[in-house]
Amino acid sequence: VSGGLLLRSAPAAALMTDSTARFSAYLEITPTGRIRITSPQSEMGQGIHDALAKILAEELEADWADVEIALPTADDALINPITRRHRTAASESVVIYRDVMRRMGASAREMLVQAAADRWQVAASECHAERSAVRHRASGRQLGFGALAVPAAVLPVPQNPALKSPADYRLVGRTTPRKDTPPKVTGQAVYGIDVQLPGMLYAALRRSPVVASRIKTFDREAALARSGVVDAFEVDEGIAIVASSTWLAWQVAKEISVEFDEAPAEGFESEALRKAMRTALDADNEARLGRALSGPAYDRDATLAALSSAPRQAEWIYEVPFLAHAALEPLCATAVVHADRAEVWAPTQQPDRCRDAIAAITGLPRERCTLHVTFLGGGFGRKWETDFVRQTVTIARELARKRPGTPVKLTWTREQDFLHDRFRPAHVARSRAGVSDDGRLLALHSRVTGPSIFTFQKRNLPPGVADPFATGLLINDFYRVPAR
C-alpha cells in the first residue's frame, strides 16, 4: 500500500496515491473501511500479532472484524522505542510496544473524530468513535472510518491523545478469534519456507560436521555435471549448490567430494566441559550482576558470613546440557540482488540486523535493501541469529554476477538445523541458602558457570559484570533476602 501520513508531533502533508490513508507505519485505513495494522514484531506462534493489534484497535475504537494484520518489514519507524532496535525476544513485545500502539490508535481516533465534526460542522466533543465509525450523538448521524480516513490524515496529529480507561476496554483482555488462524489452517499463511518467486532457483549448503572447519577442496566439476545444477561455489561457511529444486540441491550437496581442514573444535567433549564448569563453581574469580538490586546491596562476604551462621543450610546444583532450538521450520531465506537494490524474505527475529547484513554483503545503501519478515515456524531465539540470512544473501550476490535479478531460496536440511544450531549454552548452577528455624530465607548465594551468549554475540561487558542471559532471574528483585 502506498501513500500516507506518518504520525508525528506536528502536522504533515498527506501522501495519498491510492486513496488509502497511512496514519503511521503501524496503521492504514482503506476507503472500504479495512483497518490494516502492521505488527512490528515477528510472529512465531506466540500470538504477538493479535496482542499488539488489539491494543491499537482498542484505542482506535475499531471493530475487530474490520481489522487485518500485516507482517512487518525492516523499517526504522518500527524499532523498539526503548532499546532502539527492531527485534523480537525476551518476551518483551507487549511491555515495549504497549504505549506506542495505544498512542497510535488514540491519535488516529481523535483525527477521525475531528474529520467527522468538520464535515458535519459540529464540535468534536459532540462526536465519538465506536466500532469503526464516528457518531454524532445529537443527530444520530454516523460515518465509517473508510469515508473519513483521507480527510483525517491531513489534520494535525494530537500531541497528547486521550487514552481509554481499562474499565472501558472491549478488546484487550477479551477472547477474540485469532487473525492468523484461518490463513494457517487453509495454508495461505506465508512462512519463510513458503516463499515462491518467478524464476526462482534453490540453494543448499554442504558444511563440515565440525564447527569452524573450513573447505580445503571440493569437486566443483562433478557438481556442475549434474543435470539441473546451475552453479557451485564456496561461501564463508561451506559450499553452496544452486539448482532447479531444493531436493536436487540437497542431494548434490550431500554427494559431492569435499575435503575439510582440521577445525579448532575437533576433540571437544561435553564431559570435559561439564567437569570444567563444575570446577569453576569453586574458582576465586566471580562476575557480578551489572544492575542494582532493590533492598540490601549484594555483598559476597556478608552473604557467605550469613550462610555460615544460619541455623539451617541447604545446597542444590542444577545442570543443563547444550540444547538445540529445534524449530519446526528449518532455517531458510529467499533473496534477490539487483544492480541497484536487494530484497530478502526471511523468518527472522532481528530485521534490523538482517538489513544491516544485506547492505554489508551487497555493498548497497541500507535504504536500497528491503527485508520482508514472514511468519516464523518457531523461533525460540535461534532465528535471532542472522547466519542463515547472511548465507542466502551471499549466494544471491554471487548468483547475480551471472544471473542478475534471479531470486534464490536457501533451505537448511533438518540435520543441519540440529548440527549447526546456535545451541543454548550448557550451564551448571549452584545455590546455597541459609534458613531460619521458622523457615525464613536469611541468605542466598548463587553461582552459575557456562559459556556466555553475550561473548558469543560480541557484546562487550565491563570486566567483572556477569552475562545477564546466564544469570537470568536466579538473582532478582521479587523476593527480599537479607543477604544475597
Show which residues each predicted segment covers.
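Structural alpha/beta core scaffold segments of enzyme domains
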Residues: 1-484
